[in-house]
Amino acid sequence: MSLYRSKVWCVYIVRRDDGQLYTGITSDLSRRLGEHARGVGARCLRGAKRLQLLYCSASAYDHKTAAQMEYHLKRKRGKYFKLRLIKAQPRFLHQYLSADKPLR
């Protein structure tokens, strides 16, 4: 069994000290936030002095599903959608994404 398939994954959003939002996925949130704090991983977070966790979905997704939702948030949605998501704090991100139809 693949490492990706043997774990459950979540989608999270953090804010840098300059206000920039970062969206990512992980199977271990505390480990991943520690990596970000040490400057390991995402390049855009390496210079940040302080990170604030704003949102974390339920750890209920396989790697593929979590990666698809991360892609959707990063590429298909804007900052204001993410801010609404953070305010709403839905436990299950897939339901929130499917309920909010994109504008055409």
Curated annotation (Swiss-Prot):
PROSITE patterns: GIY_YIG. This is UPF0213 protein ORF82. SMART domains: GIYc. It comes from Orgyia pseudotsugata multicapsid polyhedrosis virus. Belongs to the UPF0213 family. Residues 7-83 form the GIY-YIG domain. Transmembrane segments: none annotated.
